[in-house]
Structure formats: structure tokens, C-alpha cells
Amino acid sequence: MGQEKHVFTIDWAGRQLTVEAGQLAKQANGAVMVRYGDTAVLSTATASKEPKPLDFFPLTVNYEERLYAVGKIPGGFIKREGRPSEKAVLASRLIDRPIRPLFADGFRNEVQVISIVMSVDQDCSSEMAAMFGSSLALCVSDIPFEGPIAGVTVGRIDGKFVINPTVDQLEKSDINLIVAGTKDAINMVEAGADEVPEEIMLEAIMFGHEEIKRLIAFQEEIVAAVGKEKTEIELYEIDEELSEKVKSLAEPDLLSAIQVHEKHAREDAINEVKNAVVAKFEEEEHDEDTIKKVKQTLSKLVKNEVRRLITEEKVRPDGRGVDQIRPLSSEVGLLPRTHGSGLFTRGQTQALSVCTLGALGDVQILDGLGVEESKRFMHHYNFPQFSVGETGPMRGPGRREIGHGALGERALEPVIPNEKDFPYTVRLVSEVLESNGSTSQASICASTLAMMDAGVPIKAPVAGIAMGLVKSGEYYTVLTDIQGMEDALGDMDFKVAGTEKGVTALQMDIKIEGLSREILEEALQQAKKGRMEILNSMLSTLGESRKELSQYAPKILTMNINPDKIRDVIGPSGKQINKIIEDTGVKIDIEQDGTIFISSTDESSNQKAKKIIEDLVREVEVGQLYLGKVKRIEKFGAFVEIFSGKDGLVHISELALERVGKVEDVVKIGDEILVKVTEIDKQGRVNLSRKAVLREEKEKEQEQQQS
């Protein structure tokens, strides 16, 4: 079989984007190699030939990192890649979210989209290349897909927007926005920002969309040249006659059940109606397939009725107005031995966050494809089953937990004080205790309170809120503070976090093809109003960060030494620094510029370690007097330690004013004597004199007697 390779090229933000099709992974339904600068990503799309007997679309998106892409060999004994890194999980979610809405309702064939990162140029995003490649692999395949989509990164430097900023440019940018969409609309947003106003964030999104249109035109050109004909598939549909029968049996009672305000009572009421309808069909002895379709019809009926109530009557399941927030409450200082804790409750959503402060040596070490080697601020999110009143296995964090944790981290990072002002590692853990929607945003609010309780001098408090949307034709309703049912049955989950001044994080997922500028603008403004209300509630609990850290938090002492003296502090094979740590019980972190951070829960231990280090790096000055201790005696003189780690020789002729026959006649080991530095020779050896000190003292006495 021949290997006909088709190559397509375009300029993308000043760097070359090349697509190769037809040579690699030809047994997949669709495959492309995307080269962006020196970044290379192989993206493939594969689908099962038959639909799966499921009531959801089985799509899997994987972004696979290979350390060979940056010339690294994995650490550990196994020497191969293990479980995906946090960055890989987030990238998989990033690609999944814009492509998922573009498969037809009722499509049940299993689809797997895999992107393998094979080479990384740090200034050419492998995530953006993988998103482009994933869309294109689906488009050139025979898998039914209503794309293409594309995504870009948008930065803002000195007030000007930049597409796909380099690593250096991102350092100067106050926005790090990833936006994806079709040629007609936006369908995914992920952003971090330094308290940027909503209006500017909206302009950044629309700026990114213009570049997306160009990338989609490029994909359409490639599809026209090498794309396969799409497979005809049979979509899963429910018989209309059955639907009408189910509707007639359920509708009267379902409407009132949907409008029960309390979550569990509402679920019970809806289930009661569903069970009654299913029971009637079971009495008529219908087969299992029909019963399954009845249950699916009932679920669809609930969805349609909730959406109708919201769009036509502006009525929400719990009775709130469209822009009304659920009851708010918060509390701090719940856990006495932790460094800081905050509890935030919004309706039936509740999060408890705990702040832990550590030394700079406690940073998280990153071993991935990026340039970042460590991070000193972390936010971890846990979602136990009891938060929704269910049982289930206790597993490690999944994609959702990692994604929500990262969103909170992004929202809070802009307000974390820098290392110079606050030399601590900060770890936040958010425990979701109750869930009825917007738990990620509740964790942001609780984390802000926990840091303030811990005494972290944050630049400003941060609050988060989740906005929803129900769209029917040209009509739509934007919802403030969506609960679980509105999230599940609505068209959008738009999370906005920020301070009083502006936005620090955005995340938008939708289930429809895209959103217009008008809807985005309305959602952002409505979110701002809600965020201010939440911030006011939080600040009524704790108005500002505590002035003092917890007594259980480590105390950190900072000192600076000459960088050339770092080796003296560390010692051969770390012997010296390990001895200091062992003797004082502190942690010591040394920067290359000579900054030293000493930490422990005991301030006196810090001071003790500081004194030892000061003595180690102290420079001996000729002519200076020192009170030293005799450490060793030889025939020719006495060795005196003038400060920790520094000895000098007092020759026998320099011990006294008169002639000395034997060193032991004047000093013994352990004696403290005042000596003067007379010389430091070329080999760094220090010569001391007691005679010089005695002579000076005698001369002073004579002067005083004469006067």
C-alpha cells in the first residue's frame, strides 16, 4: 500500500502551522500530524462500527504526553510514563469540551480521540495543536461530526491582545485565555486573569474568535482535499406514539413535582411520578426495551418541562428569580489545629476549605513537558459521595476533581502574595460537604476565607459564581447561581470568579453549538452583580486577613548571605547544613542569590540556626578583636575558635607580654580569651595575638593614670 502524504501549511501567530495527512496511523478513521513550530502532535479519531446500548454518547478524549518530546527520561525505577499528569488531564478536558456538543443527539457509537505529543516547542502550545488536530482528525474521518472547531490562546500585553503568546509574553500578560468555537459562535472558554474587567474579557474572547474563523477555513480546505465521506448512522430515537402516551400519563403530576423547592424532596416527588408511569407499562407486560424507552422518555419530559418553565414563565425549580442567589452563610476558624479554615454555604451547596502554610521547600515539584519546575500555591478539590447523599467507592481524584481544583487555583493565584513578601508555600484543600451545583465556585469562596483566617495577606478577596442558560430558538434566559438540576438540564455552565476589581478566572462549557456575543455579555454582567453580593456576604464574616499567623504555622526567618558562601553553609556532601538542621530542628531553603529561608514552629530555633549560619559565613577582619575559645593546644601555640567553624592560631610568642615557656602555663582547653587578628595569610589561615590585646589594655591603663 502506498503512503501518499498530503501537506498543508498556514501562518499561525507568526509561526508555521503544518498539517500532514495520509501517511501515519492509516487504520484509524481519521489521523493527522500537526506541526506548530517545532511542536508535533499526532491526533487520531476512531469510532466503533455499531452503536452501544447506552443512554449517553460514549466519547473519550485523551491528550497523551511523552517525555521524549522534551528529551527527558521518566524518573523512578520503571522509566516509562505512568498515569497522566495533571496538565495532561486538564488538556484532555480542554479538547473534550468544545467537540462534545457537535455530535448529533442520539449518536451512540463509541468515539475515541487521542492526541500524542511527540515534540514540544515551549513557545508553540501543544494543547492548541492537539485541539486543532483533534477537530481535524474527526473532520477528515468518516465519523459524523458537525465541526470543525478550533481554539487559540489570547494574551494581553500593555493593553494589546496577542494570539498564542510565547512563554516570555505570558509572563507579561494580564490575561491567559483559551477560547474555542465554530466559525459562527464560541463554545468553550477557559481563562485566568489579573483582576481584568468583564468588558475587556469579552473583547478578548471576540478577538480570539476572529482567529478561530481563519483556522476553521484552513481545516475546511484540508477536508475538501483529503476528507472521507461521512458514514450514514442510525440515531437513537424513541417512538413518537410511545412518547405521547408517557406524556399523557405523567404530565399533570410531573409539573408540580418539578416545582418542589427542596432538592431531595423534589427528586423523590419526580421519582414517584416516574415509578407510577413505569408501573403502568409493566402491568401491560411490555418488554425490557420498551420499559427502558419509557424511562428515557420520562427523563426527557422532565428536561423539557424544566426548560419550558424557565424560558416561558421565568420560573426556576426552587422558586427563585432568574438572577437570585440562594441563601448565603460562612464561618471561619472551625478547625483549631489547622493554620486556617473557612466554611461557605450557598443553599444546599457547602464547601469546607483548609489552608496549610509550609516552607518554600514544600513546593510541588513538576516533572512534565512544560518549563515550570515547581509551584508554591496549590488548590486541591475533593468530592466525596456523601455530599450528594450517595454511597460509592473512595478513589483518587478523577478528571472532574482535578479540573475543579485547577479552576480554583487559577481563580485564587492572582491574589497570592509573592515569595518575597510572603515566603511560604500555600496549600488549600476544599472538601465538598454538600452538593447541589456550583461546588467549584463554593470551594473558591471557602478557600478565600481559609486563607484570610490563616493570615495570608491576599491582595483581595475572591468569590465565584456559576451562571446558566436555557435557550429555545431565539429566546433564552440567563440564570444566576445554577443548582444541580439547572446545570444538568440547561445549555451552559459559565463559571466566573473574581475580586471587586475584576475577573480572575472564567470557565464556560455549553451543550449547544455556540453562544453569541450578546449572551456572553449578559452572562458576564449578571455574574458580576452576583459576585459582588457574595463578596459582601463573605466579608461580613471576616473583613480582612488576620494580622497574625496561626501559632501552629511555621515561622519563617529570611536572611541573605554572599552567594560565594553558600558552599560553606552546605558543607561537603551537605554535612554542614544537615548538622544545623539536626541541632536546631529547623528547615532550611537556600536560593542561588544567597537568600536563606529558615523555618520552624519555634522562633528561638530559627534564631539559633541563623546565628550558626552567620558565624559560618562571617568574614574574619584583620585588626578585629574576638572572644574565642581554646580548642586545641600544641607545643608551638594554641588554636582558638573565634566563632563557629573558624579557628585561628595564637603562637606561643603571642600568648603573653612576657616570655612563655609552656603554652599550658597560660591557657587550657576550654578557656575563653580575647584575641586580635593580626594576619590572614595567602592560604586563608588566621593568625591571632593575645599579646597585642594585653599591650593595648596596658597602654590604655597608663594613659588613664597619666590623665
Curated annotation (Swiss-Prot):
Segments forming domain S1 motif: 623-691
A GO term, aspect molecular function: polyribonucleotide nucleotidyltransferase activity
Main location: cytoplasm
CDD domains from the UniProt entry: KH-I_PNPase (cd02393), RNase_PH_PNPase_1 (cd11363), RNase_PH_PNPase_2 (cd11364), S1_PNPase (cd04472)
Family, similarity comment: Belongs to the polyribonucleotide nucleotidyltransferase family.
NCBIfam families named among the record's database cross-references: polynuc_phos (TIGR03591), PRK11824.1 (NF008805)
Protein's UniProt name: Polyribonucleotide nucleotidyltransferase
Species assigned in the record: Bacillus velezensis (strain DSM 23117 / BGSC 10A6 / LMG 26770 / FZB42)
Gene: pnp
